[in-house]
Swiss-Prot record:
Membrane-traversing stretches: 496-516
Positions contributing to ATP binding: 125-133, 151
Domain Protein kinase, first and last residues per copy: 119-497
Listed InterPro entries: ABC1_dom, Kinase-like_dom_sf, UbiB, UbiB_bact, UbiB_kinase
Gene of this entry: ubiB
Protein name as annotated: Probable protein kinase UbiB
């Protein structure tokens, strides 16, 4: 289908499902709304707007369904009724012909499939818009037979994606220029985010690298299993990983009858997430029930099994500090500190007044404290902060929006397993440990150790550099020599002060830790 024909199809779907009312209601051009009313005269729309939007996206195909799923995570931009409805979108499409999958594998490895796998199940076990999964058996480097899951990219996806994305970018430009809410909704930003998301999913080597990183990070935590990646069998269009066997986490009664401790399972999920966030700064960002199973094997009984690593989040130390300090300030009801943190982040316009931002944050956050602490949703706290920040033109970073979406998923899953789950009591030790690591002597020692090779490299060179400098200067220029010696003395005094001050600081912290237990509040 040509781009023009596809554009006509999209316009027809928009009018059929009444999305013109949803979009044009904020347009500043009265004539545009008038023309649309004439075209759609006599149309009856009974369904709510969120349902109509969901059905329209489903009718436009899998790429638009995925776009709706991404929109559902941007609750800082979307009204709640629309975000809730879009969250119901399912990325389910009929599987493509197994012969096509086999041809893709043979093209990737340049040999017959019988030489790649010991056996290959033609019937796919899962299918989505981007890829489908088959089970197979390989021989690893040691010659052992291993059961694997083979993810094969759906052929011909890139041209379709690029065509639909070009239309989305064009429509986003129209909305941003014509709508009164265009700048606030940032449609171009959302489409660009979706563009990156889709192209990341199209690279299965990238997904394999994500899985390998998570597996390495989680090796010391006996709560979660990450499948092994078989790199000899991976390609941009084919991903081969260890086959994992477990029970889907939403089959709670089956897990309970098997003897799994359900409340512990809920707490373990939160522990896994906060370990990935605050210890590793690298987290699985697609933690919906379809990607999580629970092992019933005797040696790994009750552990989580994570699947599908196409979407991950990465946090810097600055991001982690922003999160930790915002959460702790929120639970202290220190709204001024929350406002200051937003301004210190550098994401706020320079003219923003702290007291105005503080008042807005107080208005949004204070009602939470009418309920028990265990009922407070950390994901909703972040969401409300982001929504308030948007009013002040704060540029919320994409990785934090991704984290907020994942946190909401984790909370929802945890409370589905255990309605009495106290998320804050589980998260608090991670925040305390992270704050202690940032403020305590461990951080100073880490920084000194990290810089030691640099100091060791330059210190032996200082006498030679000084000698070379003096030789290059005229012998009668004693003023420069005196100035250099004076500077050297000042530098020596400064270094001594830093060393003595650092030792005093470390000793003071050690004494403080002996007599005072460090707590957030």
């Amino acid at each position: 289908m040509s781009r023009f024909a596809r554009g006509i199809t999209i316009v027809w779907v928009v009018l059929r499902y009444g999305l013109d009312e949803l979009v044009l209601s904020t347009f500043r051009q009265p004539w545009l709304r008038a023309v649309t009313r004439v075209i759609t005269f006599g149309r009856k729309l009974d369904a709510p707007r969120g349902q109509r939007l969901r059905e329209a996206l489903e009718s436009l195909g899998p790429i638009f369904v995925k776009f709706g799923q991404v929109l559902s995570t941007r609750r800082d931009l979307m009204p709640p009724d629309i975000a809730d409805e879009l969250a119901l979108l399912q990325d389910r499409v009929p599987p493509f012909d197994p012969d096509v999958a086999i041809a893709t594998i043979e093209r990737a490895f340049r040999r017959p499939i019988g030489e790649v796998f010991v056996s290959f199940d033609r019937q796919p076990v899962a299918s989505a818009s981007i890829a489908q999964v088959h089970f197979a058996v390989i021989r690893d480097r040691q010659g052992h037979a291993r059961e694997v899951a083979v993810k094969v990219l759906r052929p011909g996806m890139l041209p379709v994606i690029d065509k639909d994305l070009a239309l989305m970018r064009m429509m986003a430009g129209w909305v941003e220029s014509l709508s009164a809410d265009g700048k606030r909704l940032k449609p171009r930003e959302v489409v660009a985010e979706f563009d990156n998301y889709l192209h990341d999913e199209l690279d299965l080597v990238r997904e394999a690298a994500n899985a390998a990183q998570l597996r390495r990070n989680m090796q010391g935590l006996d709560l979660v299993l990450i499948p092994e990646v078989f790199w000899d069998f991976c390609h941009a269009e084919v991903l081969v990983m260890e086959r994992m066997k477990g029970v889907p986490i939403n089959q709670v009664e089956r897990l309970r009858s098997a003897g799994v401790d359900i409340p512990k399972l809920a707490r373990d999920g939160v522990t896994i997430f906060f370990t990935q966030v605050f210890r590793d700064g690298f987290f699985h960002a697609d933690m919906h029930p379809g990607n999580i199973q629970v092992s019933l094997a005797p040696e790994t009984f009750g552990r989580y099994i994570s699947l599908d690593f196409g979407i991950v989040g990465t946090l810097t130390e600055f991001d982690k500090e922003y999160l930790a300090q915002n959460f702790t300030a929120f639970f202290r009801r220190d709204y001024k500190r929350v406002a200051e943190l937003h301004i210190e982040s550098g994401w706020v316009p320079a003219h923003t007044r702290v007291n105005e931002l503080e008042a807005a944050i107080r208005t949004v956050c204070e009602p939470y404290f009418d309920r028990p602490l265990k009922e407070i949703s950390l994901g909703m706290v972040l969401l409300r902060l982001f929504q308030t920040s948007r009013r002040f033109q704060v540029e919320i970073q994409p990785q934090l929006v991704l984290l907020q979406k994942t946190l909401l998923n984790i909370e929802g899953l945890g409370r589905q397993l255990d309605p009495d789950l106290d998320l804050w009591s589980t998260a608090k030790p991670f925040l305390e440990k992270w704050m202690l690591d940032q403020l305590g002597p461990q951080r100073l020692w880490r920084e000194l150790r990290a810089e030691a090779p640099h100091y060791a490299k330059i210190l032996p060179d200082l006498p030679r550099l000084l000698h070379d400098f003096l030789r290059q200067r005229p012998h009668d220029n004693r003023g420069d020599l005196q100035e250099l010696l004076a500077t050297q003395k000042r530098t020596n005094r400064l270094l001594q002060s830093i060393i003595y001050g650092g030792l005093g600081f470390v000793l003071g912290l050690l004494v403080m830790q002996l007599f005072v237990r460090v707590r957030i509040f």
